């Protein structure tokens, strides 16, 4: 048994070294000890139209008797298209049992992306559909969690009369939380306009590890003195309801002029509701650390107020 494990380890290490040598910066180590890796695959390196992130975890039995545990991450990959690609990867494994297959998987995905780019253009319709689905999932939750003060939720493209500061704000990174091979890390930046939100996201995505996260959930709140209102918005990035929960936490803490992004790297084990606890704990910790929160008494009052709103909402639904 030990000899088999040693042989698997050696073959895995050789394959990992080969992948890093072949793909360079596209290949990303998420967790070396847990053997979780990620690679960003595009149809074209110079002018990518379609991109997909393949995340893999190598079990001890791979490549001898077990396949890699994998996840395909792309906002446009849904339904039959996702099923077809998954079937293709599983066929490759069946045809090459006992062999190292990561390279074959990557190149198969690249072939699919190239074919897709030749058949269609990634027009606004694809992106718009994804955004609308995300908004529909969150609308009820955000409305139920709104505090009594007037709040305005805006899309990035809406132009505001408020003077926009185009300087990239400083970004702080929180201490990661790891549970059952999933890792969560919060990132915080002061923001005073939606354009800065976009700048912060762009800067974070320059980091290949953050860009390859399974989910990058974020929320922001900007206070407009002249209108006595908040501009606020949130994004699930595929983790349903996580953005709304994060925004609700920021409302409870009564923070303003700040955005929080929480990156999650999925480790292959489902966490259930615990994932929301870790997302909010990451966010709360960095908000407290950077002195964005009110006193505990004020936060408790706000929490009570929000609970009352949610309870009234629930009663009306039943």
From Swiss-Prot:
GO biological process, one term: GCN2-mediated signaling
Coiled-coil annotated spans: none
SMART domains for the chain: RWD
Gene Ontology MF terms in the entry: actin binding; protein sequestering activity
Residue ranges annotated for the RWD domain, each copy included: 14-116
Superkingdom classification of source: Eukaryota
InterPro entries: Impact (IPR023582), Impact_N (IPR001498), Impact_N_sf (IPR036956), Ribosomal_Su5_D2-typ_SF (IPR020568), RWD_dom (IPR006575), UBQ-conjugating_enzyme/RWD (IPR016135), UPF0029_Impact_CS (IPR020569)
Keyword Repressor: yes
Family: Belongs to the IMPACT family.
Self-association and partners: Interacts with GCN1; prevents the interaction of GCN1 with EIF2AK4/GCN2 and inhibits EIF2AK4/GCN2 kinase activity. Interaction with RPL39; this interaction occurs in a GCN1-independent manner. Associates with ribosomes; this interaction occurs in a GCN1-independent manner. Associates with actin; this interaction occurs in a GCN1-independent manner.
Record-given protein name: Protein IMPACT
Organism whose genome encodes this protein: Bos taurus
């Amino acid at each position: 048994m030990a000899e088999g494990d040693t042989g698997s380890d050696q073959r895995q290490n050789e394959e990992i070294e080969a992948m890093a040598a072949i793909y360079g910066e596209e290949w990303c180590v998420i967790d070396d000890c847990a053997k979780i890796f990620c690679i960003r695959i595009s149809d074209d390196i110079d002018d990518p139209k379609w991109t997909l992130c393949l995340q893999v975890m190598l079990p001890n039995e791979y490549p001898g008797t077990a396949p890699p545990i994998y996840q395909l991450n792309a906002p446009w990959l849904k339904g039959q298209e996702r099923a077809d690609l998954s079937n293709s990867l599983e066929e490759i494994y069946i045809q090459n049992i006992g062999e190292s297959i990561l390279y074959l998987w990557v190149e198969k995905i690249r072939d699919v992306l190239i074919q897709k780019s030749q058949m269609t253009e990634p027009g606004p319709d694809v992106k718009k559909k994804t955004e609308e689905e995300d908004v529909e999932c969150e609308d009820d939750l955000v409305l139920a969690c709104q505090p009594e003060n007037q709040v305005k939720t805006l899309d990035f493209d809406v132009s505001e009369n408020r003077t926009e500061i185009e300087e990239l704000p400083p970004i702080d990174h929180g201490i990661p939380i790891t549970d059952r091979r999933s890792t969560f890390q919060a990132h915080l930046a002061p923001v005073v306009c939606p354009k800065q939100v976009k700048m912060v996201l762009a800067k974070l995505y320059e980091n290949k590890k953050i860009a390859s996260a399974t989910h990058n959930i974020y929320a922001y709140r900007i206070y407009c003195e002249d209108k006595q209102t908040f501009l606020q918005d949130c994004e699930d990035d595929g983790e349903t309801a996580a953005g709304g929960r994060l925004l609700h936490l920021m409302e409870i803490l009564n923070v303003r002029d700040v955005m929080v992004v929480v990156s999650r790297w999925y480790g292959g084990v489902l966490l259930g509701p615990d994932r929301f606890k870790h997302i909010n704990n990451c966010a709360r910790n960095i908000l407290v650390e950077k002195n964005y929160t009110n006193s505990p008494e004020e936060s408790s009052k706000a929490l009570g107020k929000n609970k009352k709103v949610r309870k009234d909402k629930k009663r009306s639904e039943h």
